[in-house]
């Protein structure tokens, strides 16, 4: 690995990823050619066809009035990157896609904690996707590019950060897998980290900062065929496998930054920091509030505890306001810091948590289904003060979401939406379009459930799952997984296995012990909101009783020992099994489908008959829809989805489709109750079967009497009882009216049919359709 100057002022560093029999990938960082006015800019390449530009800029003056770090990450997808014109009305890119938003979050999560505390200059990282191979994913490359451009920007940043995707394929962990290779994977992980020193062997010591992982869509089928299931130990193994790749990527970025800084001397920029509080403020707050606050933090109920701590805070602010006039923000920050210290100390020394639980205890659990009357499926899941309502809606497959982004996915049959209204935390705030956090939480719950969903052949429905966070005090995203499993089963969705989720936390610090100090790690099961805020790790894990389906980890520490992480995974599994037992008491198998849910039936028609079923400008299929009330969707392979609110309407539509696609030719002598569809000077055309008409000549309409005009006897829309008198070689059918005294032999026409055949030849064969109800 080395840095090369490919032309004057343009430098590049390359990392080669060797996956053995799975091939090699080349990641290249280039700077000095594009976006030269940014504080730092890098063009990152993955092999030859994937190219993106990351530019990092910083405001010249700090925003002293802010009490947070103003970092913004934006990912700009350009449709030209895939050789496409945007599908929007204006034919240009608009609001970011879900893929772009999720990539922003992947970048932000490891980047934000790597900046120095107290920085108040606005920092913006913009990643523009310039070229992408449809067989590759750009998100992990974007993490590395954002880190590299930030490292080059001369900012107070403790990077660089390396990101890698590893997938378990045929028992081997493969780095930077292609989309094609991922189809054979059982587990897929995006991992970001940084080098924090060297280990005992002198190799780079990598601290994992962020993990986003999921089982793949076809994991169960692959495991049944002999593939390794993604158990907790396998997941921990994957985290270790990723570390050498992360080290190589970080080293390349650092070497590039070192060479550029030595060749292109820029005047150093000073970025002032603004500590949240001064030591004098903290000492005064601690002296005044420690005892009362420690007692308040033993109150188990969240609302009562918050009320008491707010009372103490108000008293402290009032008593110290005169002493620290103009530094009120510091007083509030110092009070929060004291709260954090007390909570962490009690956990580390006494294993005593805010609400009185032990470190592995789960709060009270409650599960209930069928709580929303007309919903196709619904459930209410409660864990302590966290309350999630899950609602399932089923519809035709054609209602799947169409995706216009640079990702490989063009449509999504299962859509999971998460809502987090402000009242869930007892606050006021904006409601409306989802924020990035809501999109991210919905995506996490979706990834947890996709591996257990039935295939479209097994369950021909589009599924929309909505998670309403009605109460929040710790991990509404994992509560959403539990509520969604319950609601899906209540809707009659045949899940391959139920899924539950749990949020874990970690507190670590040096604790005095036997006259010395030791580094102590305490893993917490089912963390509260305060434990999430004051802890060192947010670790969410979802899965079945047998394996992990989704995992998300963020940590503020410079590395978590492998045995601590393995213990957290095992602890999470114990909690997951407990929750699954409670869920099974509410519902342990799919319910009957709601009477309000559509009934969808699938049939197959020959591909060369698709055009006949649709008809010119959709005339035939629209007529069937209008007559039967069913919704019809036809795929390119001849699969037809027929949906209706009742089975009779769906079957009537299927009969009509089969009459066109799998016709049984009428014979001379057969009788029908048909509808007049066209009138000419020489007779009336009568519809016998969908797509098949016959002619009653004008001479046959008068019942032996001569008539001058066809309209004197019949009009379009009239029903006639007719018999086939002749069928010409070219297929033309001649009809005669059935005498009134013979009409009893002709069966009455069904209300939903254009024509009824006397011998029922329009009925679909019993094995021609598969019903899902």
Swiss-Prot record:
Entry GO CC: cytosol
The record's similarity note reads: Belongs to the polyribonucleotide nucleotidyltransferase family.
Q: What reaction does this catalyse? A: RNA(n+1) + phosphate = RNA(n) + a ribonucleoside 5'-diphosphate
Q: What is its main location?
A: cytoplasm
Please provide the Gene Ontology terms (biological process) for this protein: mRNA catabolic process; RNA processing
**What name is this protein filed under?**
Polyribonucleotide nucleotidyltransferase
Question: Could you tell me which residue ranges the S1 motif domain spans?
Answer: 669-738
- CDD domains documented for this protein: KH-I_PNPase, RNase_PH_PNPase_2, S1_PNPase
UniProt: Mg(2+) binding residues: 532, 538
The upper taxonomy is: Bacteria, Bacillati, Actinomycetota, Actinomycetes, Mycobacteriales
In terms of InterPro entries, this protein maps to: ExoRNase_PH_dom1, ExoRNase_PH_dom2_sf, GPSI/PNP, KH_dom, KH_dom_type_1, KH_dom_type_1_sf, NA-bd_OB-fold, PNPase
Q: Which Gene3D superfamilies match?
A: GHMP Kinase, N-terminal domain, K Homology domain, type 1, Nucleic acid-binding proteins
Cite the EC number: 2.7.7.8
One Pfam family recorded for the sequence: KH_1
Cofactor(s) needed = Mg(2+)
């Amino acid at each position: 690995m080395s840095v090369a100057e490919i032309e004057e002022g343009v430098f590049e560093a390359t990392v080669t990823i060797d996956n053995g029999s799975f091939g090699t990938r080349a990641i290249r960082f280039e700077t000095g050619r594009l976006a030269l006015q940014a504080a730092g800019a890098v063009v990152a390449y993955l092999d030859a066809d994937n190219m993106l530009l990351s530019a990092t800029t910083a405001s010249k003056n700090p925003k002293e009035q802010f009490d947070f770090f103003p970092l913004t990450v934006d990912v700009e997808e350009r449709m030209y990157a895939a050789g496409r014109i945007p599908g929007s009305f204006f034919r240009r890119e608009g609001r970011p896609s879900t893929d772009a938003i999720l990539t922003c979050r992947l970048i932000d999560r490891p980047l934000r904690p790597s900046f120095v505390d107290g920085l108040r200059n606005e920092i913006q990282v913009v990643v523009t996707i310039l070229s992408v191979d449809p067989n590759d994913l750009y998100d992990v490359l974007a993490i590395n590019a954002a880190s590299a451009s930030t490292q080059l920007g001369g900012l107070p940043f403790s990077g660089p950060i390396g990101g890698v995707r590893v997938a378990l394929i045929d028992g081997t962990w493969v780095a930077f897998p292609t989309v094609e290779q991922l189809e054979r994977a059982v587990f897929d992980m995006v991992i970001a980290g940084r080098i924090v020193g060297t280990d005992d062997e002198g190799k780079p010591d990598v601290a994992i900062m962020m993990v986003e992982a999921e089982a793949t869509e076809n994991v169960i089928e692959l495991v049944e065929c002999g593939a390794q299931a993604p158990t907790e130990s396998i997941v921990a193994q994957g985290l270790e496998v990723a570390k050498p790749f992360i080290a190589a990527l970080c080293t390349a970025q650092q070497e590039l930054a070192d060479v550029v800084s030595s060749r292109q001397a820029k005047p150093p920029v000073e970025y002032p920091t603004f500590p949240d509080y001064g030591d004098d403020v903290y000492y005064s707050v601690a002296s005044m509030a420690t005892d009362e606050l420690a007692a308040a933090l033993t109150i188990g109920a969240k609302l009562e505890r918050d009320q008491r701590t707010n009372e103490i805070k108000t008293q402290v602010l009032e008593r110290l306001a005169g002493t620290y006039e103009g530094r009120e923000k510091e007083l509030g920050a110092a009070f929060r810091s004291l709260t954090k210290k007390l909570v962490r100390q009690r956990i580390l020394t006494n294993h005593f948590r805010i609400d009185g639980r032990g470190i592995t205890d789960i709060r009270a659990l409650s599960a209930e289904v069928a709580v929303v009357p007309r919903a196709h499926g619904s459930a209410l899941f409660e864990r302590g003060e966290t309350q999630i309502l899950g609602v399932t809606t089923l519809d035709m497959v054609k209602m799947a979401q169409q995706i216009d982004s640079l990702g490989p996915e063009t449509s999504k049959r299962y859509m999971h939406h998460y809502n987090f209204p402000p009242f869930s935390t007892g606050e006021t705030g904006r409601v409306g379009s989802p924020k990035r956090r809501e999109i991210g939480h919905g995506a996490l719950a979706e990834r947890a459930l996709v591996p257990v969903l039935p295939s479209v052949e097994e369950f021909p429905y589009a599924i929309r799952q909505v998670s309403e966070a009605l109460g929040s005090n710790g991990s509404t995203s994992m509560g959403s997984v539990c509520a969604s499993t319950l609601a899906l089963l209540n809707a009659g969705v045949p899940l391959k296995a139920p899924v539950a989720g749990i949020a874990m936390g970690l507190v670590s610090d040096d604790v005095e012990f036997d006259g010395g100090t030791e580094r102590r790690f305490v893993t917490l099961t089912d963390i509260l909101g305060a434990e999430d805020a004051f802890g060192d790790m947010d670790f969410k894990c979802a899965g079945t009783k047998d394996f992990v389906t989704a995992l998300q980890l963020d940590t503020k520490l410079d590395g978590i020992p492998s045995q601590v992480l393995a213990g957290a995974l095992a602890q999470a599994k114990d909690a997951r099994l407990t929750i699954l037992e409670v869920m099974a008491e509410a519902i342990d198998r799919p319910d009957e489908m709601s009477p309000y849910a559509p009934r969808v039936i699938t049939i197959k028609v020959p591909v060369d008959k698709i055009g006949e079923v649709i008809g010119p400008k959709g005339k035939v299929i629209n007529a069937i829809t209008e007559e039967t009330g069913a919704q019809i969707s036809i795929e390119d392979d001849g699969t037809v989805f027929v949906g209706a609110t009742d089975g009779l309407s769906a079957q009537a539509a299927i009969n009509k489709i089969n009459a066109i696609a799998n016709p049984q030719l009428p014979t001379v002598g057969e009788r029908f109750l048909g509808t007049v569809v066209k009138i000419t000077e020489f007779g009336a055309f009568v519809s016998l079967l969908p797509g098949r008409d016959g002619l009653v000549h004008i001479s046959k309409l008068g019942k032996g009497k001569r008539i001058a005009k066809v309209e004197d006897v019949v009009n379009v829309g009239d029903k006639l009882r007719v018999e086939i008198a002749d069928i010409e070689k070219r297929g033309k059918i001649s009809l005669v009216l059935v005498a009134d005294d013979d009409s009893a032999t002709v069966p009455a026409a069904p209300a939903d049919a254009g024509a009824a055949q006397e011998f029922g030849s329009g009925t679909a064969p019993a094995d021609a359709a598969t019903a899902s109800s």
